[in-house]
């Protein structure tokens, strides 16, 4: 792998690609263990990866692993670590004196009226930003004062706020990394973690372009339909109309047949 790729995020954070095991070829090689020798060209590799993605054959994607070095506010890291399939190692406030680095947003956001866990719109309030700076400065001052009094680092850190920056290494396989991106790129995800997800997406798109294209087509920009939703679609569409629409978008052959069967079932598809 080439030298480290670092993308700045927020005011003081970053995402850095530390290491990578495998690429698009590793996905294809893993699949061929199951399917035998077959595809050889890039076009055929892309078709195989697309097939694996749309049929939810996940294990070949787990053969690719990314390791990132991340610097993010603690409140972002706590959301991040909810994705428990990764291997994580974070800087320790027990062993190290934590730096005076805080995330300061350009503006606060207002509480969303319809979603208790979301925000909306900008709240341009200089007094609110001044209050944030005052509290974080006082908290870090108390932290240093406790250390100077001989209080253990593991206890002195209790006074530090959640907008303090932390750093961690995060190692994740591509299948679960795509799941992370599906959730954290979504509009309802908190704005701050979306910026980190976008940085990771930029790296992943460059490193595994065929897998990214399949992910974007079937998961990131795709949707799952419930039984009720399928019934509603069947009431509005005919196989003929749907086939014409799919064909106009360039879908043909087995992919066209598969798409028709997804909505109308094997017995009704043309």
UniProtKB/Swiss-Prot annotation:
Domain ThyX: 13-218
Chain location of the short sequence motif ThyX motif per the record: 82-92
Residues given in the record as FAD binding sites: 59, 82-84, 90, 173-175, 179
Any one GO molecular function term: NADPH binding
Gene3D superfamilies in the cross-refs: 3.30.1360.170
Protein family membership: Belongs to the thymidylate synthase ThyX family.
Name of the protein this chain belongs to: Flavin-dependent thymidylate synthase
Native organism taxonomy: Bacteria, Thermotogati, Deinococcota, Deinococci, Thermales
Gene assigned in the entry: thyX
């Amino acid at each position: 792998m080439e030298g480290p790729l670092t993308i700045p995020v927020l005011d003081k954070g970053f995402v850095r690609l530390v290491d990578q095991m495998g690429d698009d070829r590793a996905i294809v090689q893993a699949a061929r263990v199951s399917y035998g020798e077959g595809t050889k060209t890039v076009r055929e590799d892309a078709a195989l990866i697309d097939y694996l993605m749309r049929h939810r054959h996940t294990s070949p994607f787990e053969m690719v692993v990314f390791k990132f070095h991340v610097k993010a506010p603690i409140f972002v890291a706590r959301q991040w670590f909810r994705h428990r399939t990764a291997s994580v190692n974070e800087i320790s406030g027990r062993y190290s004196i934590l730096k005076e680095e805080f995330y300061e947003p350009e503006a606060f956001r207002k509480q969303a009226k319809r979603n208790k866990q979301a925000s909306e719109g900008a709240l341009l309030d200089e007094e609110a930003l001044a209050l944030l700076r005052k509290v974080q400065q006082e908290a870090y001052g108390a932290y240093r004062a406790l250390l100077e009094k001989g209080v253990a680092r593991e206890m002195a850190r209790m006074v530090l706020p959640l907008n303090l920056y932390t750093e961690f290494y995060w190692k994740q396989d591509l299948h679960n990394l795509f799941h992370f991106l599906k959730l954290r790129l979504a509009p309802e995800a908190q704005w701050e973690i979306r910026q980190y997800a976008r940085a990771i997406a930029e790296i992943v798109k460059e490193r595994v372009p065929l897998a990214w294209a399949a992910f974007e087509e079937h998961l990131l920009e795709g949707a799952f339909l419930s039984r009720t939703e399928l019934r509603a679609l069947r009431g509005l569409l005919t196989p003929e109309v749907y086939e014409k629409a799919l064909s106009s978008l360039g879908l043909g052959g087995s992919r066209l047949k598969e798409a028709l069967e997804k909505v109308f079932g094997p017995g009704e598809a043309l």
